[in-house]
Amino acid sequence: MVIVGAGFAGYNAARGLRKYAPDAEIVMINPTDYFLYLPLLPEVAAGLLEPRRISVSLPDRLRGVTLVLGTVTHIDLEDHKVEWLDPEGRPGGIEFDRLVLAAGSVNKLLPIPGVAEYAYGFRSIAEALFLRDHITRQLELAATTADRDERDARCTFVVVGAGYTGTEVAAQGQLFTERVARQLPALRNQPMRWLLADLADRLLPGLHPRMSATADRVLRRRGVEIRVGQSVQYAGVDSLRRTTGEEIATRSLIWCVGVRPDPLVEGLELPTDHGRLQVHETLVVRGRAHVFACGDCAAVPDVTRPGSITGMTAQHAQRQGRLVARNVAASLRGDDLEPYKHHDLGFLVDLGGWAAAANPLNVPMSGPAAKAVTRGYHLYSLPGNRTRTGLDWAVNAVLPPRAVQFGLVGRLNQATSPGTRFSS
């Protein structure tokens, strides 16, 4: 059995297959040797957690699963074969009896002039660390310039996309810049300007309005400028233009507009729904009894809302990964397959500091109580490093971390060449 991808869906599929098909040979193909717990990525960018805390070793946690480091380049569904390139560009291939597609998603990049060249993506450890270095550098450079306009521009940060990621990045980022500025006497009276923009009419448009209102209130109270119903029209190296026509001088455009299914899906030439593979309620790909799909790359029918598909969330991916393991094992035995059914446990948004918005089991919460629930859920959901993560949080509560650069940002911010700031 071959699993493509090691996100929430792929990781849980591999864990389940070890249990439900202990005698099967399980091969996982993934570009990295770790599972990334994406919900805590904003805390890495803000210097609150070390990258290792949310990077869980696959060889350590998935004993009995063969990990192949590589990026899948081609899947032959007729001959049951998967081909890949390893990190050094060497080709490889393997045949399969059952295939689980859990390739996940990548940054959604819109055709807006300058975004690919000058915006910063936020989907990987590398991007989070790069962004942290970039923000730290901007403030340190602002502290040494006598040019007021340049200082203001370097202390201005624009986040586009007010979903989960964008809202949390703006919340954590604003607190991070305030913390860094306190280390720099020259910035003691310098405002840290953060703007959060989205074409929707409110923050967190996919969540309950009460959670949106909580996030809006917390961020505005901290001075974050909320710009709903608008986005970016053009981005340059030191400024951007909003769709309202306003020009904003900034060196920091952070792109959190959303995600799209991994491009691997497009090359399969199978039926899709909004770019996601069409599957039955049992997670079997339509017309391919030996192929299963789950997570962000699969358009799984939502039985609680007939006619719609499940959202691209970690909660769904985790549950679908567990179900796909049971169904793959059942298909090998010739047993009936289970349909995907779910009951939402609620949603959580960490707003930094002691603030959060949550509705566990549809019970609305905010403030420290929501924060406790949010962190408790993350500790429960982390497949590893729970103790170290909890200790980091405890220490940071009394001893705030100091910000330093790690040298990831090259001269003129060109650590990556133009057009490659977005990693997949």
Give the residues covered by each predicted segment.
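FAD-site-proximal beta/loop scaffold in flavoenzymes
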Residues: E117-D147, D238-R241, E247-R319
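Beta1-alpha1 glycine-rich phosphate/pyrophosphate-binding loop at the start
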Residues: M1-H74, F157, Y164-L207, I254, ...
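FAD-binding core/adjacent interface of flavoenzyme oxidoreductases
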Residues: T66-V158, I254
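Rossmann-like dinucleotide-binding core of oxidoreductases
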Residues: R151-L207, T214, E225-R227, T310-A330, ...
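A Rossmann-like FAD-binding core segment of flavoenzymes
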Residues: D23, L67-V82, I94, Q174-E281, ...
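Glycine-rich, N-terminal phosphate-binding loop of Rossmann-like dinucleotide-binding domains
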Residues: A6, D86, A103-G104, T244, ...
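C-terminal, flexible cofactor-proximal segment of oxidoreductases
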Residues: A21, H316, Q320-S424
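Short glycine-rich anion-binding loops that position phosphate/pyrophosphate groups of nucleotides
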Residues: A9, G104-N107, A170, V259-P261, ...
